[in-house]
């Protein structure tokens, strides 16, 4: 071989070596969907789960990124229970199509017309290997198919079995659906919200199971030639020791997506758990458009909302540290005091002094934010309100804490954060959020949150530019909870009334708030859960909002 030919040969060899792997050998698609039964979205932040956190941070393996949301949602055409959502996570369609509307109906599901994503892959021309693992007995009928192996067992046993499959000489399944059930069991026995210690412990144990799976996958000798998609979600959350209720506690779920083609960041809007199987099918090259599925392919687009200075859009900041309440927000709203017995500058506030509002029936004592009848809000309905509230063990009626609506009818335009009754125990007061809608239902009610009587508790409401209402609570023990709702897109917040603290928009509601308020703030824009959590955590460290505005 002459010198010139040697140069040409060497150049060609070098070019081949430098080609992307996709040009030399196509990466083999693999997918794992994990459903953690009963996992609330806020559990991800309140409970230490290092393996999930590593995934969320995009630090699992080189080349893999993560998209995540703290405001995922489950199906809406059935109550937020296990069987309907399990069927949706398996098939990518909601209850109207798969016909599982409640627990006990799985055996009669319409899975011939709407098979699972595993069955679609198992019967594809590629005949992908599949596996379904579960612990709840009813799942034996969840989209059952003869070409999809099913395995029932306890969560740790199923995890170990799946690890053995992934480590086997034949490489195990290409596509796996793993339902983990013990978190739900702990919620039922000891409590979903507030997070019971057993619920916390079981979530940590679940994280260990997932960590073993991640390590096993990364240790595969073929891992470098594989293209993994790992999707983690939940079927429902819970309140007290139950789920199935409307109002957000059982609807708000986490969604975590990890893969080479995922964009690092926060998923926009209100993604659904039934987006998971559709995204997994697309990962294997399946054209999902003709399938008429209800879920969508997600994970490549993330939220473009940029964090803004906290003082931007601030309309009111009332620390209530002086006898005459003052709005210290620059160019903020004017305020007026209604009543003779409402007092500002009262000792014993959360951060310094506070506002004390006398309660009772036919009492008119409140703070009016003047000229807010037709307040200009970003995107017509975006706003954020934060406050610390101390309520007594009992109160009369369902008094407004902050409102701009005629609260005599919850379907009327406007909103209210109000004292209400606990869902399970009518003698224990709670707090909930209501807003009017243009829709036929005319109202949405979020919550209820339990209170710790005579303790300072943090509350926040925000409506984001992506059409999500988020209602948050920060408890004295440091736990930060949130629930979400997407019907705010058709909210009717223009009541033509002022925004008032301690009363409804008319300032004449029959039941006046009895309680204390500290460090109240209002913005004409939305915020993220992360921002609201930071305000709460600062307050727990005795730093008022003013210190964050500097």
List each language-model region with its residue ranges.
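Long, well-ordered early-domain segments
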Residues: 52, 59, 81-138
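Active-site His/acidic residue clusters
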Residues: 138-150, 162, 166-208, 212, ...
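Non-catalytic, well-ordered alpha-helical segments in soluble enzyme domains
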Residues: 269-303, 524-525
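Extracellular glycan-associated modules
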Residues: 307-550
């Amino acid at each position: 071989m002459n010198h010139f030919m040697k140069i040409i040969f060497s150049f060609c060899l070098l070019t081949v070596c430098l080609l992307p792997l996709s040009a030399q050998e196509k990466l083999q698609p693999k997918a794992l969907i994990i459903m953690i039964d009963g996992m609330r979205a806020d559990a991800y932040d309140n409970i230490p789960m290092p393996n999930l956190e590593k995934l969320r941070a995009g630090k699992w393996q080189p080349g893999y990124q993560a998209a995540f949301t703290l405001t995922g949602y489950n199906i809406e055409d059935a109550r937020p229970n296990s069987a309907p959502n399990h069927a949706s996570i398996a098939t990518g369609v909601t209850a109207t199509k798969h016909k599982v509307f409640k627990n006990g109906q799985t055996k009669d599901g319409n899975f011939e017309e709407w098979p699972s994503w595993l069955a679609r892959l198992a019967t594809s021309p590629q005949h992908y290997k599949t596996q379904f693992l579960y612990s709840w007995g009813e799942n034996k009928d969840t989209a059952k198919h003869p070409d999809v192996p099913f395995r029932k067992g306890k969560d740790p046993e199923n995890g170990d079995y799946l690890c053995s499959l992934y480590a086997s000489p034949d490489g195990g399944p290409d596509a796996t659906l793993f339902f983990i059930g013990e978190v739900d069991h702990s919620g039922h026995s000891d409590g979903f919200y507030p997070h019971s210690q057993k619920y916390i412990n079981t979530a940590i144990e679940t994280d260990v199971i997932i960590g073993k799976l991640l390590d096993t996958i990364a240790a595969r000798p073929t891992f470098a030639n594989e293209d993994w998609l790992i999707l983690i979600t939940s079927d429902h959350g819970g309140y007290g020791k139950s789920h199935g209720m409307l109002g957000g506690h059982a609807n708000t779920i986490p969604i975590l997506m990890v893969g080479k083609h995922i964009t690092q960041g926060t998923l926009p809007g209100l993604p659904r758990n039934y987006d998971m199987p559709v995204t997994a099918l697309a990962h294997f090259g399946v054209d999902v458009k003709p399938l008429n599925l209800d879920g969508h392919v997600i994970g490549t687009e993330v939220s473009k909302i940029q964090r803004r200075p906290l003082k931007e859009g601030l309309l009111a900041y009332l620390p209530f540290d002086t006898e005459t309440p003052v709005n210290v927000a620059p160019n903020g709203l004017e305020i007026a005091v209604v009543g003779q017995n409402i007092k500002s500058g009262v000792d014993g506030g959360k951060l310094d002094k506070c506002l004390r509002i006398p309660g009772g029936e036919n009492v008119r004592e409140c703070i009016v934010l003047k000229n807010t009848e037709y307040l200009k809000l970003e995107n017509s309905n975006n706003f954020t309100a934060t406050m610390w509230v101390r309520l007594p063990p009992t109160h009369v009626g369902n008094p407004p804490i902050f409102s701009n609506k005629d609260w005599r009818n919850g379907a009327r335009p406007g909103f209210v954060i109000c004292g209400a009754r606990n869902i399970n125990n009518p003698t224990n007061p709670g707090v909930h959020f209501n807003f009017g809608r243009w829709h036929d239902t005319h109202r949405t009610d979020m919550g209820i949150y339990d209170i710790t009587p005579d303790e300072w508790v943090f509350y926040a409401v925000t409506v984001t530019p992506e059409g999500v209402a988020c209602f948050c609570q920060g408890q004295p023990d440091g736990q930060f909870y949130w629930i979400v709702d997407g019907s705010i897109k058709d909210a009717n917040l223009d009541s033509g009334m002022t925004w008032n603290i301690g009363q409804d928009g008319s300032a004449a509601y029959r039941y006046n708030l009895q309680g204390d308020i500290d460090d109240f703030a209002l913005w004409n824009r939305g915020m993220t859960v992360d921002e609201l959590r930071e305000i709460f955590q600062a307050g727990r460290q005795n730093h008022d909002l003013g210190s964050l505005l500097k």
